[in-house]
């Protein structure tokens, strides 16, 4: 057994409009556990990330997050019920079964970060 044990890994997600993005993620279902003017720690259960008041278009346009959930359709219903796509003028598409054994949907946050929210399914 290695002595190099790990606890978790977190991404620093860029935000073009820090306050707007913080609200977006709260509407999506994340809680703000801690926040300053330049950084916020957000989590949902055991999943977390750091939202940073930092924006470079090339970074944001190529940044992706993947959230694995137990019920992707429940998450999609939540996104629709809260009107998140229209409220934030973002792109979001309904869940689809993928050939690699996942059912997921995509949404793009107000900064341009692509999120894939999905659940594992059995491959045909």
Where are these regions (language model features)?
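Acetyl-CoA-dependent GNAT
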Residues: 56, 92, 98, 119-123
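Vicinal oxygen chelate
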Residues: 65-114
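Conserved beta-strand segments that form the floor/walls of ligand-binding pockets within enzyme
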Residues: 8, 14, 50, 94, ...
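Conserved short beta-strand elements that form part of the metal-binding/catalytic scaffold
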Residues: 31-69, 114-119
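Short glycine-enriched loop/turn motifs at secondary-structure junctions
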Residues: 4-7, 57-62, 99
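Short, flexible helix/strand-to-coil boundary loops that buttress conserved ligand/catalytic motifs
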Residues: 25, 55, 79-80
